[in-house]
Amino acid sequence: MGSGYQLLQLPRERFRKTSFLVWVIILFQRAISMPLGIVTNSTLKATEIDQLVCRDKLSSTSQLKSVGLNLEGNGIATDVPSATKRWGFRSGVPPKVVSYEAGEWAENCYNLEIKKSDGSECLPLPPDGVRGFPRCRYVHKVQGTGPCPGDLAFHKNGAFFLYDRLASTVIYRGTTFAEGVVAFLILSEPKKHFWKATPAHEPVNTTDDSTSYYMTLTLSYEMSNFGGNESNTLFKVDNHTYVQLDRPHTPQFLVQLNETLRRNNRLSNSTGRLTWTLDPKIEPDVGEWAFWETKKKLFPTTSWRKLAFPNSINPHQQLLRSEPGGNCPRKN
């Protein structure tokens, strides 16, 4: 009995630290009238939100504001091969949807159109009224095939796929999305004064024009074995020229790679497919996190030295090489 009792109680020092932390949280919650709750697909219950109305800080639902928060700010890998590993197919799980009022501008969004080997579609069409995420710096458009072992594609980490003011637990076919979560912000109830002046202007709905002040660039890919253990991803330069992606990279790197291939006449010059592979010397992380500095320009000052071809190409020093078995000779 004595040893069993010892197992059920916290050590004295740990109990003191835990008690102190609990009191700090309670006092902080009392002092700050803006608690933040994160909703994932495992905690999404309307009844929980309704119960907040009966508590001290929230007197009406007008104080409850929903915000979509993107995952990319946490430093997750955003390249297509890495991102697709975070998504998986499941059967027998009903999808969940929640709306949100405001969101962030996303650096990386995705748009998938995947078919099974028999030609049938892997992903469902979006429900009526569901539109793509409206603010994307780069849209990674992926087409390809895969086993798709399940009815619907979910996020393995329990996150949402953010669309235009709508978050869903599943991926919809051909609809642009960003990865994220939904946060519910409880605002303090404003004091009402009968002499309060009317607004100087009516509020503006900034989501009407999804392209205003924001340049979107679409990057295209071909993927095989989507949803399987080992997938293969090719970056599409044009209809006959591709680059094999074998390690993490940034979208800025792909933009520069695309321009380098075109400027140096490295595109396929026939109807055959030319596939390039990256030289191991290349560092594909150029421009990492540059979007925190600015979101509205194309980073023109980034150095090209690591990607540019020399005037006289040495076969042993070139930074790109055609894949063995390619049936299309490159231009001289």
Curated annotation (Swiss-Prot):
Domain of life: Viruses
Positions annotated as glycosylated: N41, N205, N229, N239, N258, N269
Pfam families: Filo_glycop
Cellular-component GO terms for this entry: extracellular region
Compartments reported by the entry: Secreted
Protein keywords: Disulfide bond, Glycoprotein, Secreted, Signal
Chief location: secreted
Family the UniProt entry places it in: Belongs to the filoviruses glycoprotein family.
Protein name per Swiss-Prot or TrEMBL: Super small secreted glycoprotein
Organism: Reston ebolavirus (strain Reston-89)
